[in-house]
């Protein structure tokens, strides 16, 4: 098995300028992602895909393979799957095609190396099939939500669920966005990170912090200083 970690780190960011190069605990977001992949001990190649020369240079300094992403794959509306496919194609021009893909978003800077290794082990012990999502327990249970229809609001599942306690409902999770693991061929065939069966690894609340706004950045810096991570 050959495992590749791809870190998508485009240059454009409206909420936080040069977001992927801002520092948390003395390291940029992209460098933290690279280091967590290397320290996991299960990743053979670390690739950073970016349209930004400064990010690509930072990736090289940190020991990653830097792949320049075309501008048309780096806009606000570009699909992440297209950027991954491009990175895999460019990587495979100089290396054998890897078997396992790990996607690491740099905007989850408190993700632990042990989480990456645990997620990959979940994938391999299940025959390298399906996918593994990093998840966190849903703050609001989906059975207690509504769908807007022409006839008014309708419960997602049933009226009875709206009054049930959380303990009576099945455990529900949301994607943390911190890590995805999938077979490379399955990804290329389906052009999707979602391949059934979907398995999961529950991450900590601090690992699930996603840096999207200045407030998020302040929060993650505070957590990093408190936990020395």
Report the location of each language-model feature.
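Active-site acidic Asp-centered loop
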Residues: 104-105
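Short phosphate-binding loop-to-helix
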Residues: 47, 53-101, 111-121
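Alpha-helix/helix-capping structural signal
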Residues: 53, 185-186, 215
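Short, structured coil segments at secondary-structure junctions
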Residues: 42, 62-63, 149
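Hydrophobic helical membrane-anchoring modules
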Residues: 201-202, 206-229
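N-terminal glycine-rich phosphate-binding loop and ensuing alpha1 helix
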Residues: 2-49
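Conserved core of the sugar-phosphate nucleotidyltransferase
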Residues: 82, 100, 109-203
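Short active-site oxyanion
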Residues: 42-47, 130, 206-208
């Amino acid at each position: 098995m050959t495992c590749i970690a791809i870190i998508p780190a485009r240059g454009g960011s409206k909420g936080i300028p040069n977001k992927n190069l801002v520092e948390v605990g003395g390291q940029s977001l992209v460098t933290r992602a690279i280091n967590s992949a290397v320290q996991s001990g299960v990743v053979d190649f670390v690739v950073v895909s970016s349209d930004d020369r400064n990010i690509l240079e930072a990736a090289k300094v940190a020991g990653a393979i830097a792949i320049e992403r075309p501008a048309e794959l780096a806009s606000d509306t570009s699909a992440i799957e297209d950027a991954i496919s491009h990175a895999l194609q460019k990587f495979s021009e100089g290396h054998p095609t890897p078997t396992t893909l790990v996607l690491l978003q740099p905007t989850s800077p408190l993700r632990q190396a042990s989480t990456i290794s645990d997620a990959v082990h979940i994938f391999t012990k299940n025959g390298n099939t399906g996918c593994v999502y990093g998840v966190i327990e849903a703050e609001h249970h989906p059975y207690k939500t509504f769908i807007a229809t022409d006839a008014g609001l309708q419960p997602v599942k049933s009226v009875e669920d709206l009054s049930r306690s959380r303990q009576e409902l099945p455990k529900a999770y949301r994607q943390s966005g911190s890590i995805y693991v999938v077979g490379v061929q399955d990804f290329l065939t389906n052009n999707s990170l979602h391949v059934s069966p979907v398995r999961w690894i529950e991450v900590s609340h601090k690992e699930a912090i996603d840096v999207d706004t200045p407030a998020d950045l302040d929060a993650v810096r505070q957590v990093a200083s408190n936990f020395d991570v």
